[in-house]
């Protein structure tokens, strides 16, 4: 999206400025604010996406449903909704935090660094998926338990943030509970 920025953070995770999103993601990416969201359908299936080959970091890699950066003055819920519409063309509901304190740093094979305070959410998809080809090259609906097993068995096949999010016991439980509520 044109004109997007990242909110830079100091080591106490407090806002310390802003930087244009594309310029922020480099070989020495500063700590900044982001979010990650795992989307589910009414049957409790997880939407996994394959990042477009045009992405600067981890192109072509399978990952959780959607990630992004809140803009100044925007709540996380507003940011999640905005990116779901932009990347996947979907409307969502029931946004819930599953790992609010997630923070990670990872280096892509091309040297680009992710360095984020990145609260993790779950949400329910309430419309058909219409992916933006600039963001997503493929997608699949999968069973959460199957995906968690795949992440544990073959972590190299997925984005590092998805693997790290799934390694957190409380986040796994929150995702499992979210799916149970959807299935009623």
Swiss-Prot record:
Catalytic reaction list: isopentenyl diphosphate = dimethylallyl diphosphate
Cofactor note: Binds 1 Mg(2+) ion per subunit. The magnesium ion binds only when substrate is bound. Binds 1 Mn(2+) ion per subunit.
Pathway(s) per entry: Isoprenoid biosynthesis; dimethylallyl diphosphate biosynthesis; dimethylallyl diphosphate from isopentenyl diphosphate: step 1/1
Occurrences of domain Nudix hydrolase (ranges): 30-164
Gene3D superfamilies, alphabetized: Nucleoside Triphosphate Pyrophosphohydrolase (3.90.79.10)
Active site residues according to the UniProt entry: 67, 116
The organism's place on the tree of life at top rank: Bacteria
Annotated keywords: Cytoplasm, Isomerase, Isoprene biosynthesis, Magnesium, Manganese, Metal-binding
Cofactor(s) the record lists: Mg(2+); Mn(2+)
Positions that bind Mn(2+): 25, 32, 69, 114, 116
Lineage, broadest ranks: Bacteria, Pseudomonadati, Pseudomonadota, Gammaproteobacteria, Enterobacterales
Annotated function: Catalyzes the 1,3-allylic rearrangement of the homoallylic substrate isopentenyl (IPP) to its highly electrophilic allylic isomer, dimethylallyl diphosphate (DMAPP).
Family of this protein: Belongs to the IPP isomerase type 1 family.
Main location (coarse class): cytoplasm
Gene: idi
Stated name of the protein: Isopentenyl-diphosphate Delta-isomerase
Subunit structure: Homodimer.
Naturally occurring in which organism (per UniProt): Klebsiella pneumoniae subsp. pneumoniae (strain ATCC 700721 / MGH 78578)
GO annotation, cellular component aspect: cytoplasm
Gene Ontology annotations of biological process type: dimethylallyl diphosphate biosynthetic process; isoprenoid biosynthetic process
GO molecular function per UniProt: isopentenyl-diphosphate delta-isomerase activity; metal ion binding
UniProt entry tagged with the keyword Glycoprotein: no
UniProt xrefs under InterPro entries: Idi_bact, IsopentenylPP_isomerase_typ1, NUDIX_hydrolase-like_dom_sf, NUDIX_hydrolase_dom
EC id: 5.3.3.2
């Amino acid at each position: 999206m044109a004109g997007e920025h990242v909110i830079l953070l100091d080591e106490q995770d407090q806002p310390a400025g802003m930087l244009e999103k594309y310029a922020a993601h480099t070989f020495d990416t500063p700590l900044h604010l982001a979010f990650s969201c795992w989307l589910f359908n009414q049957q409790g299936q997880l939407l996994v996406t394959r990042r477009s080959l045009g992405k600067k970091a981890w192109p072509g890699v399978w990952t959780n449903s959607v990630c992004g950066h809140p803009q100044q003055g925007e709540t996380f819920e507003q940011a999640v909704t905005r990116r779901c519409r932009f990347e996947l063309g979907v409307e969502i509901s029931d946004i819930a935090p599953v790992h609010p304190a997630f923070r990670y740093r990872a280096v892509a094979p091309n040297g680009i660094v992710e360095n984020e305070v990145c609260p993790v959410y779950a949400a329910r998809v309430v419309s058909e998926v219409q992916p933006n080809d600039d963001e997503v090259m493929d997608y699949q609906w999968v069973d959460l338990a199957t995906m968690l097993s795949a992440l544990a068995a073959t972590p190299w096949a997925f984005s590092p943030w998805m693997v790290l999010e799934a390694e957190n016991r409380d986040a796994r439980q929150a995702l499992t509970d979210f799916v149970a509520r959807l299935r009623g």
